[in-house]
Amino acid sequence: MTVTYSSQVANARLGSFSRLLLCWRGSIYKLLYGEFLIFLLCYYIIRFIYRMALTDEQQVIFEKLTLYCDSYIQLIPISFVLGFYVTLVVTRWWNQYENLPWPDRLMNLVSCFVEGKDEQGRLLRRTLMRYANLGNVLILRSISAAVYKRFPSPQHLVKAGFMTPSEHKHLEKLSLPHNSFWMPWVWFANLSTKAWIGGRIRDPVLLQSLLDEMNTLRTQCGHLYAYDWISVPLVYTQVVTVAVYSFFLACLVGRQFLNPAKAYPGHEMDLVVPLFTFLQFFFYAGWLKVAEQLINPFGEDDDDFETNWIVDRSLQVSLLAVDEMHQDLPPMERDMYWNDPEPHPPYTAASAQSRRPSFFGSTFNISLGKEDMEFQPEEEEEAHTGILGHFLGLQSSDHQPPRTNSKTKLLWPKKEGHFHEGHPKNLRGARLDSSDQEDSKAWREGGFKSAALCGRPGYHSAPQTPLGHTPMVFPPEESAPLGLRRVSGIDEAAKDQSLQPATPSIKKSFELLPESAEASAEPLQGSHVRRKTVEFNLADLSEAPEHLKEPNLEPPMGIHAIIKDHRDPYWALENRDEAHS
């Protein structure tokens, strides 16, 4: 019953789709001609009454009614309502098609997994596929009028060969107040397990694959049953139907051509045939007819599913696959391209024009000059970056140092002191002895290994999140250098001195670090995991000894001048430790 026109529209040529308008079976004309004739008849009856049967006063009242209907008829959202409704119906229609039970995959597994060319093996395979076809027929008989007319009772299924008399009696014995389409699938599962126990199915993995495919078909049958049970909500269908028919009932009055002598706006001409009104009826009413035909594709319309053909085809191919084709293979022979590494199947004269070379990619035919294909030295990459590259920030790694701050600087190697205006910026590193320098080098290497890849020197990436005021944790396999052990081992006397009020200048120098740094380190000290920590308590420090102070080489410029001098707190703490020791 399905109207197939795929071959007629295989090639997009002049008139390929226009020829489809001449088809009658499954066409919109066949569905709509009755309603269209009724609409034409009603329109011309109202026109005849307006022109011939009404008095002048009655004509004036009718003309006012016509203008009123014509002005408010566009307020009905017919396109909006029809669009959503038809989309819902078409989606539902296609989902029902996708859930039609095809036994092809199941019959392949049965023919492959259930072994034995004897009478018992043949009986086992045919019975399994007959159960599968019986389950399909029972569900199609429940939802399709065409299949029900073919098998109106279980006795007809027995006479058709889908069921044996003993199986029919078994079904009647297990009669329930529910649809029994699921019973053959239970028989299939039990018989498959029996075949595995009897050695007809070698491995439980094969049995599991067979049952999975069986459950897939059972699920599809359940979906068809649910689609037949749960329809599109009735209120939605009623709203769409009322919207369409009320629109065209208003058109019967509002689209009448009035007397041109009375000079009504928009009624200067008196056309006998309202062409665009008829086209509008054809489009909107035809749109509704599409939804009416697709809402249940298991009927007997021209475009409904061929359910009886599906029943015949499924039984024929499934029994053939598991019986005559079981282990019936053609002999293996060498193909005609056995010694040909590049086989070229021949073309006929009609298909020679469709022969095409292989596609290698859109850039395959691009040609470059010899100079453009030469690699550039690294020192010339920056010069050839171009305006766009400079605009996007494409710079060489040698010209863009990584971003650091006063806290991540602890993990970086110390550089030599820079000079500004003839005065050294930092003279503290020069005063360290050789042992302290070795300790600081070992500590920096340990910090480098414990740092993430993005935090190591030479790694250029986006700015990272600033480090919090938490104690630095060294990995268990790494040990802190000697200098830092002195820092963590400050005696109680030094701690008491650090808690005393410091001078205002020292307070300003370390005002960047809050006093909550000590509180954040307390939970880690009570942890059961052994960790080596270094606590930088820079909140309140006692004044350094005189021999460790730096000479004041720059005029005081307030707190901002002190902040700009990024002094390493590691050196300050180590010198402080030596002073107390």
From Swiss-Prot:
Give one GO term, molecular function aspect.
ligand-gated channel activity
* PANTHER family assigned: BESTROPHIN (PTHR10736), BESTROPHIN-1 (PTHR10736:SF4)
Q: What is this protein called?
A: Bestrophin-1
One Pfam entry name:
Bestrophin
Primary site of residence: membrane
Whose protein is this, by species? Sus scrofa
Q: Which residues lie on this side of the membrane: Extracellular?
A: 52-60, 256-274
| Keyword Iron-sulfur recorded | no
Membrane-related topology note? Multi-pass membrane protein
Domains: entry comment:
The C-terminal auto-inhibitory segment (AS) modulates the open/closed conformation of the channel. In a closed conformation, the C-terminal auto-inhibitory segment constricts the channel concentrically by wrapping around the channel periphery in an inter-protomer manner. To allow chloride movement, the C-terminal auto-inhibitory segment opens partially, leading to significantly smaller chloride movement.
Topological domains, Cytoplasmic: 1-31, 83-237, 289-581
